[in-house]
Amino acid sequence: AVCVSLLGAANIPPQHLNLYQFKEMIRYTIPCEKTWGEYADYGCYCGAGGSGRPIDALDRCCYVHDNCYGDAEKKHKCNPKTQSYSYKLTKRTIICYGAAGTCGRIVCDCDRTTALCFGNSEYIEGHKNIDTARFCQ
């Protein structure tokens, strides 16, 4: 099945452009019946914060993404949540543009890797909105 998403740029707050771009990548890679928001509070790492061990492959995608953003901040002095970048969604993959080592390219590669990981990982309904105090220590 092919999902078609009509995305308008008029309502994008500039300070959150990267999050919009990441959301668009996720929409491109996940199954049609899912929404990007279903990934925002999943497991121990998908969403704000994170602790403990990832509970499955999908949660591991978010764990790796958190660490990738952490490296971008610490090693490269980037701000991943506001950093915009150039990319293309084409032929079932995502292409990041920009010179290697630039903040835009580093953050794009973090988001690209995670979005593709989401597309290749099973979504387990029981891992949405879990009790993180109990399962993520």
UniProtKB/Swiss-Prot annotation:
<feature type="disulfide bond">
    <location>
        <begin position="96"/>
        <end position="108"/>
    </location>
</feature>
<keyword id="KW-0638">Presynaptic neurotoxin</keyword>
<dbReference type="InterPro" id="IPR016090">
    <property type="entry name" value="PLipase_A2_dom"/>
</dbReference>
<dbReference type="Pfam" id="PF00068">
    <property type="entry name" value="Phospholip_A2_1"/>
</dbReference>
<comment type="subunit">
    <text>Heterodimer; disulfide-linked. The A chains have phospholipase A2 activity and the B chains show homology with the basic protease inhibitors.</text>
</comment>
<keyword id="KW-0964">Secreted</keyword>
<dbReference type="InterPro" id="IPR001211">
    <property type="entry name" value="PLipase_A2"/>
</dbReference>
<dbReference type="GO" id="GO:0090729">
    <property type="term" value="F:toxin activity"/>
</dbReference>
<feature type="disulfide bond">
    <location>
        <begin position="61"/>
        <end position="117"/>
    </location>
</feature>
<keyword id="KW-1015">Disulfide bond</keyword>
<keyword id="KW-0443">Lipid metabolism</keyword>
<keyword id="KW-0800">Toxin</keyword>
<feature type="binding site">
    <location>
        <position position="49"/>
    </location>
    <ligand>
        <name>Ca(2+)</name>
    </ligand>
</feature>
<feature type="active site">
    <location>
        <position position="111"/>
    </location>
</feature>
<dbReference type="InterPro" id="IPR036444">
    <property type="entry name" value="PLipase_A2_dom_sf"/>
</dbReference>
<dbReference type="GO" id="GO:0047498">
    <property type="term" value="F:calcium-dependent phospholipase A2 activity"/>
</dbReference>
<dbReference type="GO" id="GO:0005543">
    <property type="term" value="F:phospholipid binding"/>
</dbReference>
<dbReference type="GO" id="GO:0050482">
    <property type="term" value="P:arachidonate secretion"/>
</dbReference>
<comment type="similarity">
    <text>Belongs to the phospholipase A2 family. Group I subfamily. D49 sub-subfamily.</text>
</comment>
<dbReference type="InterPro" id="IPR033112">
    <property type="entry name" value="PLipase_A2_Asp_AS"/>
</dbReference>
<feature type="disulfide bond">
    <location>
        <begin position="78"/>
        <end position="103"/>
    </location>
</feature>
<keyword id="KW-0442">Lipid degradation</keyword>
<keyword id="KW-0528">Neurotoxin</keyword>
<keyword id="KW-0378">Hydrolase</keyword>
<feature type="disulfide bond">
    <location>
        <begin position="46"/>
        <end position="62"/>
    </location>
</feature>
<dbReference type="GO" id="GO:0005576">
    <property type="term" value="C:extracellular region"/>
</dbReference>
<feature type="disulfide bond">
    <location>
        <begin position="44"/>
        <end position="136"/>
    </location>
</feature>
<dbReference type="InterPro" id="IPR033113">
    <property type="entry name" value="PLipase_A2_His_AS"/>
</dbReference>
<comment type="function">
    <text>Snake venom phospholipase A2 (PLA2) that inhibits neuromuscular transmission by blocking acetylcholine release from the nerve termini. PLA2 catalyzes the calcium-dependent hydrolysis of the 2-acyl groups in 3-sn-phosphoglycerides.</text>
</comment>
<dbReference type="GO" id="GO:0006644">
    <property type="term" value="P:phospholipid metabolic process"/>
</dbReference>
<keyword id="KW-0106">Calcium</keyword>
<feature type="signal peptide">
    <location>
        <begin position="1"/>
        <end position="9"/>
    </location>
</feature>
<keyword id="KW-0732">Signal</keyword>
<dbReference type="GO" id="GO:0016042">
    <property type="term" value="P:lipid catabolic process"/>
</dbReference>
<feature type="binding site">
    <location>
        <position position="45"/>
    </location>
    <ligand>
        <name>Ca(2+)</name>
    </ligand>
</feature>
<protein>
    <recommendedName>
        <fullName>Basic phospholipase A2 beta-bungarotoxin A5 chain</fullName>
        <ecNumber>3.1.1.4</ecNumber>
    </recommendedName>
</protein>
<feature type="propeptide">
    <location>
        <begin position="10"/>
        <end position="17"/>
    </location>
</feature>
<dbReference type="GO" id="GO:0005509">
    <property type="term" value="F:calcium ion binding"/>
</dbReference>
<feature type="binding site">
    <location>
        <position position="47"/>
    </location>
    <ligand>
        <name>Ca(2+)</name>
    </ligand>
</feature>
<keyword id="KW-0479">Metal-binding</keyword>
<feature type="binding site">
    <location>
        <position position="66"/>
    </location>
    <ligand>
        <name>Ca(2+)</name>
    </ligand>
</feature>
<feature type="active site">
    <location>
        <position position="65"/>
    </location>
</feature>
